Amino acid sequence: MVRNEKKCIGIIFGGTSNEHYVSISSAKTVFKALISRTNKELFRIKAFYINKHGVWIDSDLSLEILRENSGNNIFEKYQELPNRKINFLNNLEFQNIDIWFPLLHGCNGEDGAIHGLLKFTQKPLIGCGISGSAIGMDKILMKQIFSNLSIPQVNFLAIQNYDLSDDNVKDNLSVEIIEKLNLPVFVKPANSGSSLGISKAKNKSEIIKALQKAWEIDSRIVIEEGLNVRELECGIIGNLKLSTSKIGEVSYSSDWYDYDSKYSTDNKIIIPADIDSQISEQIKDLAIRSCRALNIYGFARVDFFLEKISRKIFLNEINTIPGFTSKSMFPMLWKASGLNIDQLVAKLIDISLDS
Protein backbone atom coordinates (compact mmCIF):
# COMPACT_ATOMS: atom_id res chain seq x y z
CA MET A 1 0.00 0.00 0.00
CA VAL A 2 1.27 3.49 -0.92
CA ARG A 3 0.96 6.02 1.91
CA ASN A 4 0.77 9.70 0.95
CA GLU A 5 0.91 11.05 4.50
CA LYS A 6 1.58 9.86 7.99
CA LYS A 7 -1.28 7.86 9.48
CA CYS A 8 -2.16 8.53 13.10
CA ILE A 9 -2.31 5.29 15.08
CA GLY A 10 -4.36 5.28 18.28
CA ILE A 11 -2.98 2.72 20.74
CA ILE A 12 -5.34 1.75 23.56
CA PHE A 13 -3.85 -0.18 26.47
CA GLY A 14 -4.13 -1.00 30.18
CA GLY A 15 -7.73 -1.75 31.05
CA THR A 16 -9.64 -3.25 33.95
CA SER A 17 -8.90 -6.94 33.38
CA ASN A 18 -6.41 -9.09 35.27
CA GLU A 19 -4.13 -8.80 32.23
CA HIS A 20 -3.58 -5.06 32.77
CA TYR A 21 0.22 -5.26 32.94
CA VAL A 22 0.47 -7.69 30.03
CA SER A 23 -1.42 -5.09 27.99
CA ILE A 24 1.06 -2.39 28.99
CA SER A 25 3.97 -4.59 27.92
CA SER A 26 2.30 -5.35 24.59
CA ALA A 27 1.65 -1.64 23.96
CA LYS A 28 5.27 -0.79 24.70
CA THR A 29 6.43 -3.30 22.08
CA VAL A 30 4.05 -1.90 19.45
CA PHE A 31 5.03 1.68 20.35
CA LYS A 32 8.73 0.89 19.83
CA ALA A 33 7.92 -0.71 16.48
CA LEU A 34 6.00 2.38 15.35
CA ILE A 35 8.84 4.77 16.24
CA SER A 36 11.51 2.52 14.73
CA ARG A 37 13.71 3.74 11.89
CA THR A 38 11.57 1.70 9.49
CA ASN A 39 8.23 3.20 10.55
CA LYS A 40 8.82 6.62 12.12
CA GLU A 41 8.27 8.48 8.83
CA LEU A 42 5.07 6.54 8.13
CA PHE A 43 3.09 6.88 11.35
CA ARG A 44 2.14 9.32 14.08
CA ILE A 45 1.06 7.95 17.46
CA LYS A 46 -1.54 8.83 20.01
CA ALA A 47 -1.87 6.58 23.03
CA PHE A 48 -4.71 6.20 25.51
CA TYR A 49 -4.08 4.46 28.79
CA ILE A 50 -7.06 3.03 30.68
CA ASN A 51 -6.23 2.60 34.36
CA LYS A 52 -7.44 -0.24 36.57
CA HIS A 53 -10.58 1.73 37.47
CA GLY A 54 -11.57 2.10 33.81
CA VAL A 55 -10.58 5.76 33.60
CA TRP A 56 -9.16 6.95 30.27
CA ILE A 57 -5.98 9.04 30.61
CA ASP A 58 -5.06 11.74 28.08
CA SER A 59 -2.69 11.01 25.21
CA ASP A 60 0.32 13.03 26.38
CA LEU A 61 0.51 11.22 29.70
CA SER A 62 -0.27 7.88 28.05
CA LEU A 63 2.71 8.34 25.74
CA GLU A 64 4.86 9.07 28.80
CA ILE A 65 3.81 5.70 30.20
CA LEU A 66 4.88 3.93 27.01
CA ARG A 67 8.25 5.69 27.09
CA GLU A 68 8.90 4.62 30.70
CA ASN A 69 11.72 2.11 31.05
CA SER A 70 10.82 1.20 34.62
CA GLY A 71 9.07 -1.97 35.70
CA ASN A 72 5.32 -2.34 36.01
CA ASN A 73 5.25 -0.95 39.57
CA ILE A 74 5.68 2.53 38.09
CA PHE A 75 2.13 2.39 36.74
CA GLU A 76 0.58 2.35 40.19
CA LYS A 77 1.04 6.13 40.30
CA TYR A 78 -1.25 6.50 37.27
CA GLN A 79 -4.30 4.96 38.93
CA GLU A 80 -5.56 8.24 40.43
CA LEU A 81 -5.24 11.18 38.05
CA PRO A 82 -8.43 13.26 38.32
CA ASN A 83 -7.02 16.14 36.27
CA ARG A 84 -5.92 13.98 33.37
CA LYS A 85 -9.17 12.11 32.76
CA ILE A 86 -10.90 12.37 29.39
CA ASN A 87 -14.41 11.68 28.16
CA PHE A 88 -14.19 9.29 25.23
CA LEU A 89 -17.01 10.52 23.02
CA ASN A 90 -16.57 14.26 23.63
CA ASN A 91 -12.79 14.60 23.48
CA LEU A 92 -11.08 16.26 20.53
CA GLU A 93 -8.05 14.00 20.89
CA PHE A 94 -9.94 11.18 19.20
CA GLN A 95 -10.89 13.11 16.06
CA ASN A 96 -7.47 12.87 14.40
CA ILE A 97 -7.05 9.11 14.76
CA ASP A 98 -6.80 7.27 11.42
CA ILE A 99 -6.52 3.69 12.71
CA TRP A 100 -7.14 2.22 16.15
CA PHE A 101 -4.83 -0.41 17.62
CA PRO A 102 -6.59 -1.84 20.70
CA LEU A 103 -4.21 -3.85 22.88
CA LEU A 104 -6.54 -4.58 25.78
CA HIS A 105 -6.16 -8.23 26.76
CA GLY A 106 -8.96 -10.07 28.54
CA CYS A 107 -12.39 -8.82 29.55
CA ASN A 108 -13.61 -5.36 28.47
CA GLY A 109 -11.14 -5.44 25.61
CA GLU A 110 -10.47 -8.71 23.85
CA ASP A 111 -14.13 -9.70 24.32
CA GLY A 112 -15.37 -7.17 21.77
CA ALA A 113 -16.32 -4.43 24.23
CA ILE A 114 -13.68 -1.97 22.99
CA HIS A 115 -14.46 -2.88 19.37
CA GLY A 116 -18.10 -1.87 19.84
CA LEU A 117 -17.10 1.45 21.38
CA LEU A 118 -14.57 2.23 18.65
CA LYS A 119 -17.14 1.50 15.96
CA PHE A 120 -18.81 4.80 16.86
CA THR A 121 -15.69 6.65 15.68
CA GLN A 122 -16.14 5.23 12.16
CA LYS A 123 -12.40 4.59 11.89
CA PRO A 124 -10.77 1.25 11.05
CA LEU A 125 -9.18 -0.82 13.77
CA ILE A 126 -6.48 -3.45 13.77
CA GLY A 127 -7.98 -6.84 14.53
CA CYS A 128 -11.36 -8.44 14.05
CA GLY A 129 -14.83 -7.08 14.76
CA ILE A 130 -17.28 -7.35 17.62
CA SER A 131 -18.72 -10.81 16.94
CA GLY A 132 -15.42 -12.60 16.32
CA SER A 133 -13.86 -11.00 19.39
CA ALA A 134 -16.80 -11.86 21.65
CA ILE A 135 -17.03 -15.49 20.53
CA GLY A 136 -13.25 -15.94 20.55
CA MET A 137 -13.17 -14.83 24.19
CA ASP A 138 -16.11 -17.01 25.25
CA LYS A 139 -14.79 -20.56 25.55
CA ILE A 140 -18.28 -22.07 25.80
CA LEU A 141 -19.70 -20.42 22.67
CA MET A 142 -16.49 -21.09 20.78
CA LYS A 143 -16.48 -24.78 21.66
CA GLN A 144 -20.16 -25.18 20.80
CA ILE A 145 -19.58 -23.72 17.34
CA PHE A 146 -16.54 -25.92 16.78
CA SER A 147 -18.55 -28.97 17.86
CA ASN A 148 -21.26 -28.15 15.32
CA LEU A 149 -18.60 -27.92 12.60
CA SER A 150 -16.83 -31.15 13.70
CA ILE A 151 -13.59 -29.28 14.43
CA PRO A 152 -11.61 -31.62 16.72
CA GLN A 153 -11.45 -30.64 20.40
CA VAL A 154 -10.78 -32.43 23.67
CA ASN A 155 -13.89 -33.69 25.47
CA PHE A 156 -15.48 -30.96 27.59
CA LEU A 157 -18.42 -29.97 29.75
CA ALA A 158 -19.93 -26.50 30.10
CA ILE A 159 -21.33 -25.24 33.41
CA GLN A 160 -23.65 -22.24 33.34
CA ASN A 161 -26.14 -20.65 35.75
CA TYR A 162 -25.16 -22.63 38.86
CA ASP A 163 -24.79 -21.10 42.31
CA LEU A 164 -21.36 -22.40 43.24
CA SER A 165 -21.50 -20.71 46.63
CA ASP A 166 -23.58 -23.78 47.57
CA ASP A 167 -21.28 -26.65 48.60
CA ASN A 168 -23.89 -29.23 47.62
CA VAL A 169 -23.98 -27.85 44.08
CA LYS A 170 -20.19 -28.09 43.79
CA ASP A 171 -20.27 -31.62 45.19
CA ASN A 172 -22.92 -32.76 42.69
CA LEU A 173 -21.10 -31.13 39.79
CA SER A 174 -17.82 -32.78 40.74
CA VAL A 175 -19.52 -36.19 40.66
CA GLU A 176 -20.96 -35.44 37.21
CA ILE A 177 -17.56 -34.33 35.92
CA ILE A 178 -15.89 -37.54 37.13
CA GLU A 179 -18.65 -39.63 35.51
CA LYS A 180 -18.41 -37.92 32.12
CA LEU A 181 -14.72 -37.06 31.73
CA ASN A 182 -11.47 -38.91 32.29
CA LEU A 183 -9.21 -37.47 34.97
CA PRO A 184 -7.28 -35.26 35.23
CA VAL A 185 -9.40 -32.34 34.07
CA PHE A 186 -8.75 -28.65 33.53
CA VAL A 187 -11.30 -26.26 35.00
CA LYS A 188 -11.44 -22.87 33.26
CA PRO A 189 -13.46 -19.66 33.49
CA ALA A 190 -15.32 -19.25 30.19
CA ASN A 191 -14.08 -15.67 29.76
CA SER A 192 -10.49 -15.26 30.85
CA GLY A 193 -7.04 -15.11 29.29
CA SER A 194 -3.40 -15.87 30.11
CA SER A 195 -4.54 -19.03 31.97
CA LEU A 196 -5.93 -16.92 34.83
CA GLY A 197 -8.32 -18.85 37.07
CA ILE A 198 -7.47 -22.20 35.48
CA SER A 199 -6.72 -25.27 37.60
CA LYS A 200 -5.69 -28.85 36.95
CA ALA A 201 -7.71 -31.29 39.07
CA LYS A 202 -6.92 -34.97 39.62
CA ASN A 203 -9.66 -35.94 42.08
CA LYS A 204 -13.00 -34.86 43.51
CA SER A 205 -11.65 -32.51 46.19
CA GLU A 206 -9.38 -30.77 43.68
CA ILE A 207 -12.31 -30.40 41.26
CA ILE A 208 -14.39 -28.71 43.97
CA LYS A 209 -11.56 -26.26 44.73
CA ALA A 210 -11.03 -25.62 41.02
CA LEU A 211 -14.72 -24.90 40.46
CA GLN A 212 -14.66 -22.33 43.25
CA LYS A 213 -11.52 -20.67 41.87
CA ALA A 214 -12.96 -20.42 38.35
CA TRP A 215 -16.35 -19.23 39.61
CA GLU A 216 -14.70 -16.30 41.39
CA ILE A 217 -13.74 -15.02 37.92
CA ASP A 218 -16.73 -16.12 35.83
CA SER A 219 -20.09 -17.78 36.56
CA ARG A 220 -19.71 -19.75 33.33
CA ILE A 221 -17.09 -22.51 33.44
CA VAL A 222 -15.55 -25.02 31.02
CA ILE A 223 -14.15 -28.37 32.15
CA GLU A 224 -11.81 -30.12 29.73
CA GLU A 225 -10.41 -33.62 29.75
CA GLY A 226 -6.66 -33.53 30.32
CA LEU A 227 -4.49 -35.38 27.82
CA ASN A 228 -0.77 -36.01 27.39
CA VAL A 229 -0.12 -33.37 24.75
CA ARG A 230 2.31 -30.98 23.16
CA GLU A 231 1.18 -27.34 22.90
CA LEU A 232 1.46 -25.89 19.39
CA GLU A 233 0.53 -22.42 18.14
CA CYS A 234 -0.06 -20.78 14.77
CA GLY A 235 -0.27 -17.10 13.87
CA ILE A 236 -2.91 -15.73 11.49
CA ILE A 237 -3.00 -12.40 9.64
CA GLY A 238 -5.21 -11.14 6.82
CA ASN A 239 -8.77 -10.32 5.85
CA LEU A 240 -10.40 -12.10 2.91
CA LYS A 241 -7.21 -14.09 2.48
CA LEU A 242 -5.73 -15.40 5.72
CA SER A 243 -2.03 -16.19 5.93
CA THR A 244 -0.48 -18.56 8.45
CA SER A 245 2.87 -18.38 10.19
CA LYS A 246 5.22 -21.22 10.91
CA ILE A 247 4.07 -23.49 13.73
CA GLY A 248 5.61 -22.91 17.16
CA GLU A 249 5.78 -25.10 20.24
CA VAL A 250 5.92 -24.12 23.90
CA SER A 251 8.04 -26.38 26.08
CA TYR A 252 7.82 -25.90 29.84
CA SER A 253 9.16 -27.61 32.94
CA SER A 254 6.02 -27.19 35.07
CA ASP A 255 3.19 -29.72 35.25
CA TRP A 256 1.10 -27.65 32.83
CA TYR A 257 1.16 -24.31 31.02
CA ASP A 258 -0.30 -22.04 33.71
CA TYR A 259 -0.03 -18.25 34.14
CA ASP A 260 3.35 -18.43 35.87
CA SER A 261 4.70 -20.71 33.14
CA LYS A 262 3.54 -18.36 30.38
CA TYR A 263 5.62 -15.50 31.73
CA SER A 264 8.49 -17.54 33.15
CA THR A 265 12.05 -17.42 31.86
CA ASP A 266 12.13 -21.23 32.10
CA ASN A 267 9.92 -21.61 29.03
CA LYS A 268 11.41 -22.75 25.78
CA ILE A 269 9.78 -21.61 22.55
CA ILE A 270 10.65 -23.74 19.54
CA ILE A 271 10.01 -22.29 16.07
CA PRO A 272 9.48 -24.11 13.83
CA ALA A 273 8.06 -26.90 15.96
CA ASP A 274 9.60 -30.33 15.46
CA ILE A 275 6.62 -31.85 13.64
CA ASP A 276 6.25 -33.43 10.22
CA SER A 277 4.91 -31.45 7.27
CA GLN A 278 1.57 -33.29 7.24
CA ILE A 279 0.77 -32.26 10.83
CA SER A 280 1.96 -28.72 10.11
CA GLU A 281 -0.39 -28.40 7.14
CA GLN A 282 -3.30 -29.87 9.11
CA ILE A 283 -2.76 -27.29 11.84
CA LYS A 284 -2.60 -24.43 9.34
CA ASP A 285 -5.78 -25.62 7.62
CA LEU A 286 -7.59 -25.92 10.96
CA ALA A 287 -6.36 -22.48 12.01
CA ILE A 288 -7.84 -20.86 8.91
CA ARG A 289 -11.03 -22.93 9.11
CA SER A 290 -11.62 -22.05 12.76
CA CYS A 291 -11.02 -18.32 12.20
CA ARG A 292 -13.44 -18.33 9.29
CA ALA A 293 -16.02 -20.11 11.45
CA LEU A 294 -15.90 -17.38 14.11
CA ASN A 295 -15.51 -14.41 11.72
CA ILE A 296 -12.01 -13.71 13.02
CA TYR A 297 -9.66 -11.70 10.80
CA GLY A 298 -6.93 -9.08 11.05
CA PHE A 299 -4.66 -11.04 13.35
CA ALA A 300 -4.97 -13.87 15.85
CA ARG A 301 -3.09 -16.74 17.44
CA VAL A 302 -4.65 -20.19 17.25
CA ASP A 303 -3.59 -22.74 19.88
CA PHE A 304 -3.58 -26.51 19.42
CA PHE A 305 -2.89 -29.71 21.31
CA LEU A 306 -1.01 -32.59 19.67
CA GLU A 307 -1.58 -35.81 21.59
CA LYS A 308 1.81 -37.45 22.05
CA ILE A 309 0.78 -41.08 21.54
CA SER A 310 -2.08 -40.95 19.02
CA ARG A 311 -0.70 -37.88 17.18
CA LYS A 312 -4.25 -36.50 17.05
CA ILE A 313 -4.64 -32.74 16.69
CA PHE A 314 -7.13 -30.83 18.87
CA LEU A 315 -7.97 -27.16 18.60
CA ASN A 316 -7.61 -25.49 21.99
CA GLU A 317 -8.60 -21.83 21.53
CA ILE A 318 -8.21 -18.65 19.49
CA ASN A 319 -6.70 -15.45 20.89
CA THR A 320 -7.96 -12.41 18.99
CA ILE A 321 -5.55 -9.98 20.69
CA PRO A 322 -2.50 -12.15 21.35
CA GLY A 323 0.34 -10.78 23.42
CA PHE A 324 2.96 -8.55 21.81
CA THR A 325 5.43 -8.67 24.70
CA SER A 326 9.08 -9.62 24.31
CA LYS A 327 8.15 -13.14 25.46
CA SER A 328 5.01 -13.51 23.36
CA MET A 329 4.66 -16.26 20.80
CA PHE A 330 2.75 -14.26 18.17
CA PRO A 331 5.53 -11.82 17.12
CA MET A 332 8.08 -14.63 17.41
CA LEU A 333 6.07 -16.79 15.01
CA TRP A 334 6.00 -14.04 12.42
CA LYS A 335 9.66 -13.17 12.87
CA ALA A 336 10.49 -16.80 12.06
CA SER A 337 8.14 -16.50 9.07
CA GLY A 338 9.96 -13.48 7.64
CA LEU A 339 8.34 -10.45 9.33
CA ASN A 340 10.22 -8.74 12.15
CA ILE A 341 8.20 -6.77 14.70
CA ASP A 342 8.51 -3.46 12.80
CA GLN A 343 7.35 -5.09 9.57
CA LEU A 344 4.59 -7.02 11.33
CA VAL A 345 3.05 -3.92 12.90
CA ALA A 346 3.17 -2.07 9.56
CA LYS A 347 1.61 -5.09 7.85
CA LEU A 348 -1.25 -5.18 10.35
CA ILE A 349 -1.92 -1.49 9.70
CA ASP A 350 -2.05 -2.13 5.95
CA ILE A 351 -4.46 -5.02 6.52
CA SER A 352 -6.78 -2.81 8.57
CA LEU A 353 -6.79 -0.12 5.88
CA ASP A 354 -7.64 -2.70 3.21
CA SER A 355 -10.57 -4.16 5.16
Swiss-Prot record:
Its EC number is 6.3.2.4. Pathway: Cell wall biogenesis; peptidoglycan biosynthesis. Its main location: cytoplasm. One of its GO terms (biological process) is peptidoglycan biosynthetic process. GO terms for cellular component: cytosol. Keywords: ATP-binding, Cell shape, Cell wall biogenesis/degradation, Cytoplasm, Ligase, Magnesium, Manganese, Metal-binding, Nucleotide-binding, Peptidoglycan synthesis. Signal peptide: none annotated. One of its GO terms (molecular function) is ATP binding. SUPFAM superfamilies: Glutathione synthetase ATP-binding domain-like, PreATP-grasp domain. Mg(2+) 2 binds at residues 317, 319. Binds 2 magnesium or manganese ions per subunit. ATP binds at residues 178-233. Its cofactor is Mg(2+); Mn(2+). Mg(2+) 1 binds at residues 303, 317. Residues 143-350 form the ATP-grasp domain. It catalyses: 2 D-alanine + ATP = D-alanyl-D-alanine + ADP + phosphate + H(+). It is found in: Cytoplasm. Belongs to the D-alanine--D-alanine ligase family. Cell wall formation. PANTHER family: D-ALANINE--D-ALANINE LIGASE (PTHR23132), D-ALANINE--D-ALANINE LIGASE A (PTHR23132:SF25). This is D-alanine--D-alanine ligase. It comes from Prochlorococcus marinus (strain MIT 9515). The gene is ddl.
